C-alpha cells in the first residue's frame, strides 16, 4: 500500500532541493488542466449566450402574438 506520509516527505524534500525543477514539473502537469478548463468555460459561455438569445426570441414572438390578438379584438 502507498505510504502517503513518506510520499509527501519525498515531495517536500524534492521541492526544497530543486525548486525550479519542482515548479516546472508542477506547471507542466497543470497546463493541460488549465487549457481544458478554459475551453470548457468558453463553451459554457457560448451555450448560455445561445440560450439567452433563444429565450429573448421566444419572448418577442409571444409579445407579437399577444399584440396581434389584441389588435384583432379591437
UniProtKB/Swiss-Prot annotation:
Keywords: Coiled coil, Membrane, Transmembrane, Transmembrane helix. Residues 53-66 have a biased composition (Basic and acidic residues). Pfam families: UPF0542 (PF15086). The chain crosses the membrane at residues 20-40. Residues 53-74 are annotated as: Disordered. It is found in: Membrane. It is a single-pass membrane protein. The keyword Chloroplast does not apply. The keyword Transmembrane helix applies. One of its GO terms (cellular component) is membrane. Signal peptide: none annotated. Residues 42-74 form a coiled coil. Belongs to the SMIM15 family. This is Small integral membrane protein 15.
